[in-house]
């Protein structure tokens, strides 16, 4: 319990900080070349018309080329979208194709107990904290969801499946990536994210609670949506130099 208290305290301190915008360009990240992925297996749903844009021609596996401009911290570093598995084995482990009475598939398999990391007693590690005005948060998914995270948190720490990266509408940002500014204080359940979908997790998630979602907070003025590009700032001078730019001269 002492560890849990210390851990939550640390999370609360770091999570409430307003994340400074960073500019992360992934344009140099090459598209996954044909033949570099083993696309065999019964779990793969190959669609020839999608083969140039999605791994193995299957949208569930995410785009073959990552978004070119994504404000998500150390997005590329150490990111292995399949967690060491082949695409077929990844889908076999994390996707349930069983159809229900309505004919719809069960779909992605999500962790129990709201996705929080579990302690030695199998209880979720979480605590109530207040999100203060000016805090930037974001999420991958529609505003009908109940989860948000500190803006710009590394993707691998969110433990999300690769379909969240689909970017056929806008090549710079994933289709369903949303950024919000907290304008009125509200309370959330905060805690570490359980490793899942082959990802390391242990980022911070904010669970809004049962019976309430992001849209509710947008409607009542607690959140205001921003453009994802608002997190990406083009700045010059000391501290903002990129690798492909000339050094800033000290001379007048």
Question: What does each of the following model-derived ranges do?
Answer:
Residues 1-21, 252:
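Fungal secretory targeting signals
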Residues 150-151:
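Histidine-centered catalytic micro-motifs used for acid/base chemistry in nuclease
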Residues 9-11, 129, 172:
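A generic structural signal for short, solvent-exposed coil/turn residues
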Residues 18-119, 140-145, 154-252:
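Conserved NAD+-utilizing ADP-ribose enzyme module
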């Amino acid at each position: 319990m002492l560890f849990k208290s210390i851990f939550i305290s640390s999370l609360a301190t770091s999570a409430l900080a307003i994340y400074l915008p960073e500019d992360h360009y992934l344009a140099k990240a090459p598209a996954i070349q044909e033949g570099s992925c083993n696309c065999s297996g019964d779990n793969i749903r190959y669609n020839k018309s999608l083969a140039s844009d999605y791994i193995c021609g299957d949208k569930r596996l995410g785009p073959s080329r990552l978004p070119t401009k994504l404000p998500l911290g150390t997005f590329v570093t150490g990111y292995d979208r399949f967690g060491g598995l082949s695409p077929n084995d990844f889908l076999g482990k994390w996707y349930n194709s069983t159809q229900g009475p309505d004919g719809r598939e069960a779909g992605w398999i999500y962790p129990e107990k709201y996705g929080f990391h579990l302690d030695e007693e199998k209880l979720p590690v979480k605590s109530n904290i207040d999100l203060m005005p000016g805090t930037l948060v974001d999420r991958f998914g529609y505003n009908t969801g109940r989860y948000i995270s500190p803006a710009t948190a590394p993707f691998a720490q969110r433990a999300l499946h690769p379909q969240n990266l689909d970017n056929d509408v806008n090549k710079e940002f994933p289709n369903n990536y949303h950024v919000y500014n907290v304008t009125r204080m509200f309370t959330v359940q905060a805690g570490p994210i359980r490793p899942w979908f082959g990802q390391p997790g242990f980022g911070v998630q904010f669970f809004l609670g049962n019976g309430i979602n992001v849209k509710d907070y947008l409607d009542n003025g607690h959140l205001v949506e921003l453009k994802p590009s608002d997190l990406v700032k083009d700045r010059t001078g000391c501290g903002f130099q990129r690798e492909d730019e000339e050094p800033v001269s000290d001379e007048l």
